[in-house]
C-alpha cells in the first residue's frame, strides 16, 4: 500500500531486475521475489522513494476535516440524524469528519481486555464535554487529563440500556504545541 504522491507501482518497476514478478497501481502493488532478495528489494524501494524528494507527505496521514468546529454546541442528535441522510457512506461518499482545533482532555480511560481502546472526555472552550472513543487506538491517542489537543472525529449516537448519548468516534488526536 502507498499514500500521498508515492506510487507503489512505480516503486515496483524501479526494482524489476530484483523481483520475479510484480505489478499494481499508484495506491498498491504486489511482488513475488526470492527470500534472499528481500533486503535488496527494501533498499531499492527506499532509494526510489528518496530519489523522488517528496515533501509535505504528512498531510496525507491526517484525516481530512470536512468541517472545523469551534465547540461542541452543535454536536447533537439532530446533527447525527442529518449526517445519516447522506448515507450510504463508502468509496466516493466518505463519512464526514469534524475537527475541533482546541479541546482539553478532561479524562482518559483505557478499555478492552488489553487496554487497547480509549475513551477520552474532551472539553471545549465553553465547558461543553463530548466523549470520544477509539478502538484499537495507537498509543498517541491515550492523552492525559489537562492536555490541550486537536481532535478529528465522526459524531455518533451511543445507545446503552435505553439511554441515548451523542459521542465522537475518534479518528485522530494531536497534542497542541
Label each residue range with its predicted role.
Residues 1-177:
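Acidic, two-metal ion nucleic-acid-processing modules in DNA metabolism proteins
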Amino acid at each position: 500500500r502507498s499514500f500521498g504522491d508515492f506510487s507503489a507501482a512505480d516503486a515496483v518497476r524501479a526494482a524489476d531486475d530484483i523481483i520475479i514478478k510484480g505489478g499494481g497501481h499508484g495506491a498498491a502493488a504486489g511482488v513475488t521475489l526470492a527470500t534472499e532478495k528481500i533486503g535488496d528489494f527494501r533498499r531499492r524501494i527506499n532509494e526510489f522513494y528518496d530519489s523522488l524528494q517528496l515533501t509535505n507527505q504528512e498531510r496525507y496521514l491526517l484525516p481530512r476535516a470536512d468541517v472545523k468546529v469551534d465547540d461542541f454546541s452543535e454536536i447533537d442528535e439532530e446533527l447525527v440524524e442529518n449526517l445519516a441522510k447522506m448515507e450510504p457512506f463508502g468509496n466516493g461518499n466518505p463519512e464526514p469528519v469534524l475537527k475541533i482545533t482546541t479541546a482539553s482532555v478532561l479524562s482518559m480511560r483505557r478499555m478492552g481486555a488489553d487496554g487497547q481502546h480509549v475513551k477520552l472526555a474532551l472539553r471545549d472552550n465553553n465547558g461543553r464535554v463530548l466523549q470520544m472513543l477509539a478502538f484499537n487506538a495507537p498509543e498517541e491517542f491515550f492523552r492525559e487529563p489537562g492536555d490541550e489537543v486537536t481532535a478529528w472525529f465522526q459524531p455518533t449516537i451511543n445507545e446503552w440500556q435505553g439511554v441515548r448519548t451523542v459521542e465522537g468516534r475518534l479518528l485522530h488526536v494531536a497534542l497542541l504545541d
